[in-house]
Protein backbone atom coordinates (compact mmCIF):
# COMPACT_ATOMS: atom_id res chain seq x y z
CA UNK A 1 0.00 0.00 0.00
CA UNK A 2 1.10 3.54 -0.72
CA UNK A 3 0.01 6.92 0.57
CA UNK A 4 -1.21 9.60 -1.84
CA UNK A 5 -2.27 13.20 -1.19
CA UNK A 6 -5.50 14.43 -2.73
CA UNK A 7 -5.92 18.13 -3.45
CA UNK A 8 -9.06 20.19 -2.81
CA UNK A 9 -10.33 19.12 -6.23
CA UNK A 10 -9.98 15.46 -5.22
CA UNK A 11 -7.14 14.86 -7.69
CA UNK A 12 -3.81 13.25 -6.79
CA UNK A 13 -1.15 15.90 -6.14
CA UNK A 14 2.20 15.16 -7.83
CA UNK A 15 5.77 16.45 -7.44
CA UNK A 16 5.02 18.58 -4.40
CA UNK A 17 6.18 19.13 -0.84
CA UNK A 18 3.16 19.01 1.44
CA UNK A 19 4.02 20.11 4.97
CA UNK A 20 6.89 17.77 5.94
CA UNK A 21 6.11 15.16 3.25
CA UNK A 22 6.88 14.92 -0.46
CA UNK A 23 4.91 13.19 -3.21
CA UNK A 24 6.65 12.03 -6.39
CA UNK A 25 5.66 12.21 -10.07
CA UNK A 26 3.08 9.47 -9.52
CA UNK A 27 1.70 11.23 -6.45
CA UNK A 28 3.09 8.60 -4.07
CA UNK A 29 4.52 9.70 -0.70
CA UNK A 30 8.32 9.40 -0.79
CA UNK A 31 10.07 7.40 1.95
CA UNK A 32 13.77 6.71 2.65
CA UNK A 33 14.77 9.02 -0.17
CA UNK A 34 16.75 12.14 -1.04
CA UNK A 35 14.91 14.86 -2.95
CA UNK A 36 16.37 18.07 -4.38
CA UNK A 37 13.81 20.88 -4.53
CA UNK A 38 14.12 24.29 -6.15
CA UNK A 39 14.62 27.19 -3.74
CA UNK A 40 11.26 28.96 -3.61
CA UNK A 41 12.13 31.01 -0.49
CA UNK A 42 14.58 33.58 -1.88
CA UNK A 43 15.73 32.43 -5.31
CA UNK A 44 17.39 35.75 -6.22
CA UNK A 45 19.61 35.99 -3.15
CA UNK A 46 23.31 35.30 -3.88
CA UNK A 47 23.69 33.77 -0.39
CA UNK A 48 21.11 31.03 -0.88
CA UNK A 49 21.44 28.06 -3.23
CA UNK A 50 19.24 27.47 -6.27
CA UNK A 51 17.94 24.28 -4.64
CA UNK A 52 17.88 22.48 -1.29
CA UNK A 53 18.35 18.79 -0.50
CA UNK A 54 15.89 17.05 1.82
CA UNK A 55 15.87 13.54 3.22
CA UNK A 56 12.49 11.88 3.72
CA UNK A 57 12.66 9.17 6.38
CA UNK A 58 10.87 5.81 6.57
CA UNK A 59 7.68 7.46 7.88
CA UNK A 60 7.75 9.92 4.96
CA UNK A 61 8.55 12.97 7.09
CA UNK A 62 11.52 15.11 6.18
CA UNK A 63 14.44 15.03 8.61
CA UNK A 64 14.32 18.27 10.63
CA UNK A 65 16.86 19.61 13.16
CA UNK A 66 18.66 16.29 13.34
CA UNK A 67 21.60 14.19 12.23
CA UNK A 68 20.97 11.37 9.75
CA UNK A 69 23.47 8.60 8.96
CA UNK A 70 23.27 7.50 5.34
CA UNK A 71 25.78 5.18 3.61
CA UNK A 72 28.20 5.50 6.57
CA UNK A 73 28.21 9.31 6.36
CA UNK A 74 26.57 11.84 8.67
CA UNK A 75 24.34 14.66 7.39
CA UNK A 76 22.58 17.41 9.32
CA UNK A 77 19.19 18.84 8.42
CA UNK A 78 18.22 22.26 9.75
CA UNK A 79 14.90 23.49 11.16
CA UNK A 80 13.50 23.87 7.62
CA UNK A 81 14.59 20.35 6.65
CA UNK A 82 17.38 21.60 4.36
CA UNK A 83 20.62 19.63 4.28
CA UNK A 84 23.16 21.89 6.00
CA UNK A 85 26.44 22.65 4.24
CA UNK A 86 29.67 24.53 4.90
CA UNK A 87 30.81 25.59 8.36
CA UNK A 88 27.71 25.12 10.50
CA UNK A 89 27.13 25.66 14.22
CA UNK A 90 25.02 22.95 15.88
CA UNK A 91 24.40 22.89 19.63
CA UNK A 92 27.38 25.15 20.33
CA UNK A 93 29.90 23.22 18.21
CA UNK A 94 31.10 24.02 14.68
CA UNK A 95 31.13 21.33 11.99
CA UNK A 96 32.13 21.35 8.34
CA UNK A 97 29.43 19.74 6.24
CA UNK A 98 30.91 19.90 2.77
CA UNK A 99 29.41 21.69 -0.21
CA UNK A 100 25.91 21.92 -1.64
CA UNK A 101 26.83 18.92 -3.82
CA UNK A 102 27.66 16.48 -1.00
CA UNK A 103 26.89 17.90 2.48
CA UNK A 104 28.36 15.18 4.68
CA UNK A 105 30.26 15.81 7.94
CA UNK A 106 34.04 16.02 7.55
CA UNK A 107 36.71 14.98 10.03
CA UNK A 108 40.44 15.66 10.02
CA UNK A 109 42.15 18.50 8.17
CA UNK A 110 40.07 20.79 5.93
CA UNK A 111 41.33 23.86 4.06
CA UNK A 112 38.65 26.53 3.71
CA UNK A 113 38.42 29.95 2.11
CA UNK A 114 37.81 32.75 4.59
CA UNK A 115 35.33 34.65 2.42
CA UNK A 116 34.60 32.99 -0.90
CA UNK A 117 32.73 36.10 -2.17
CA UNK A 118 35.77 38.38 -1.81
CA UNK A 119 38.36 38.61 -4.57
CA UNK A 120 41.67 37.08 -3.49
CA UNK A 121 40.12 35.36 -0.48
CA UNK A 122 42.63 33.68 1.78
CA UNK A 123 42.50 30.08 2.90
CA UNK A 124 43.09 28.62 6.35
CA UNK A 125 43.50 25.11 7.71
CA UNK A 126 40.97 23.80 10.23
CA UNK A 127 40.92 20.52 12.11
CA UNK A 128 37.74 18.56 12.87
CA UNK A 129 37.91 15.85 15.54
CA UNK A 130 36.60 12.32 14.93
CA UNK A 131 33.15 13.46 16.18
CA UNK A 132 33.18 16.20 13.53
CA UNK A 133 33.56 19.08 15.99
CA UNK A 134 36.01 21.79 14.97
CA UNK A 135 38.99 22.45 17.24
CA UNK A 136 38.38 26.08 18.24
CA UNK A 137 41.03 27.66 20.48
CA UNK A 138 43.72 25.32 21.68
CA UNK A 139 47.41 26.00 22.10
CA UNK A 140 48.79 22.46 22.11
CA UNK A 141 46.58 20.19 20.04
CA UNK A 142 48.51 17.00 19.27
CA UNK A 143 47.64 15.56 15.86
CA UNK A 144 49.56 12.63 14.39
CA UNK A 145 52.52 13.26 16.71
CA UNK A 146 52.86 17.02 16.04
CA UNK A 147 51.56 19.96 18.06
CA UNK A 148 49.45 22.72 16.53
CA UNK A 149 47.92 25.97 17.74
CA UNK A 150 44.37 26.92 16.81
CA UNK A 151 42.69 30.27 17.43
CA UNK A 152 39.01 30.59 16.50
CA UNK A 153 39.36 27.31 14.64
CA UNK A 154 42.20 28.40 12.35
CA UNK A 155 45.57 26.67 12.49
CA UNK A 156 48.13 29.34 13.30
CA UNK A 157 51.41 29.91 11.48
CA UNK A 158 54.11 32.52 11.86
CA UNK A 159 54.24 34.73 14.97
CA UNK A 160 51.51 33.95 17.50
CA UNK A 161 50.92 35.75 20.81
CA UNK A 162 50.29 32.91 23.24
CA UNK A 163 49.28 33.15 26.89
CA UNK A 164 51.75 32.32 29.61
CA UNK A 165 50.85 29.62 32.12
CA UNK A 166 49.67 32.28 34.60
CA UNK A 167 47.36 33.81 31.95
CA UNK A 168 45.58 30.54 31.23
CA UNK A 169 42.43 30.34 33.33
CA UNK A 170 40.09 28.62 30.90
CA UNK A 171 39.81 24.94 31.82
CA UNK A 172 39.68 24.04 28.11
CA UNK A 173 42.93 25.82 27.30
CA UNK A 174 46.29 24.24 27.91
CA UNK A 175 49.72 25.77 28.32
CA UNK A 176 51.68 26.18 25.12
CA UNK A 177 54.35 23.66 24.20
CA UNK A 178 57.35 25.75 23.23
Predicted regions, residues:
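Extracellular adhesion/carbohydrate-binding repeat motifs centered on closely spaced tryptophans
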Residues: 1-178
Amino acid sequence: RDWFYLGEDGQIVKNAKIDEYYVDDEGKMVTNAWVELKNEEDPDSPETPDAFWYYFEKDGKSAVSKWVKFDSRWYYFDEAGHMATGKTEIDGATYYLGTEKDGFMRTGWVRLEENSHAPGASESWYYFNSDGKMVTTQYDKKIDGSYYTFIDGKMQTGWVLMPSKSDVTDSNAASPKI
